[in-house]
Amino acid sequence: MVECLTGKKILIKGNYAIANAAVLAGCQCYFGYPITPQSEIGEFMSGKMQELGRSYVSAESELAAINMTIGACATGAKAMSSSSSCAIALMQEALSYAASDELPVVLISVMRGGPGLGNIYSSQGDYFQTTKGGGNGDYKLIALAPSTVQECVDLTYKAFYLAHKYKNPTVLLADGLLGQMMEPVEFKPYPYPEIDNSEWALTGAKGRKSRIIRSYAPLADEQCVFLEKLFNKYKQIEENETEWEEIGTEDADIVLVSFGSTFRNIKTAAKICRQKGLKVGVFRPITLYPFPHKRLNELADRVKKFISVEVNMGQMINDIKLSVDGKVPVELIHKPVGAPPAPEDIAAQVEELA
């Protein structure tokens, strides 16, 4: 069991770092079901939450876990679940309900290979699942993608903050490699203000009017009004919370784009390309939703080509193409599953595509 420490730097595995950060963010309830490669999160929470007098439930299924999380969030609690890929697929109906109910669910998704049962190797194959939504109807999940174990901590903090700020389900999307990787991490105190939920949380109606949280709108006009309200909120999220990182794009002819742990390799690949005389920059969406469409469109006015580097068969490339809007070509370098392509291999393919 990893001790929960604030203000100290320790060598720690990604999954333990995420769980540690959730506790420090004030997570009051955790509901989970074990699945590789994220089982260490539940392992950590099983001891630490009870030690702190908080709630931990090892649920009978993934469906039960996410619906328990919804119930806890309806009371205004900071509640979280975690799972992986094929098990996250089982949660899609509940996530649609959580978005419709406007509840601050935090979900940790540590990706493994697919489709179907797939395998336990690292993957980035759940980009579509997270950013396009597997549940019914018009809704969005805020999605944050760390590239280091330190960012697993920092973005777990942010996931709790954004979920409660916007009353919207928020996913920390980490590839399995990050979940199992060990790196030095500093656990700083939770940096965000606490959000007042007293106006909506179901905390008992004594002394006030009764409240109802629901996703059912029996009349078409009522549903139209609700969806307009929901998408006005998404517009605010897109305007205020879009986050990315870019390096060497000011003079680049080619920009490599990736998310998660793959970003580490494209940074090295870009340096190799620069040494060979190719002007290559790198770009990383930190928020997968909201996606940095506007910034990529601006870059497309002066670069000659984008190359998406992914550990899947090509998913984020579709959003890059949408962002670029046909101004320049968009190519793909990928591996279907496992560790990201090696920097030398990426650089060699960039030379071929240049």
Task: For each feature predicted by the language model, list its residue ranges.
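Thiamine diphosphate
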Residues: M1-G133, K140, T148, P336, ...
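Glycine-/acidic-rich phosphate or pyrophosphate-binding loops and their flanking alpha/beta elements
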Residues: K13-A17, F231-I254, K267, K271
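Short beta-strand segments
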Residues: S83, V106-V110, L144-P146, V171-D175, ...
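Conserved thiamine diphosphate
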Residues: S122-D175, A342
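Conformationally flexible catalytic loops at phosphate/diphosphate-handling active centers
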Residues: K167-E246
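Generic long, charged, amphipathic alpha-helical segments
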Residues: I266-L299
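Peripheral docking tails and interdomain loops at the edges
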Residues: E310-A354
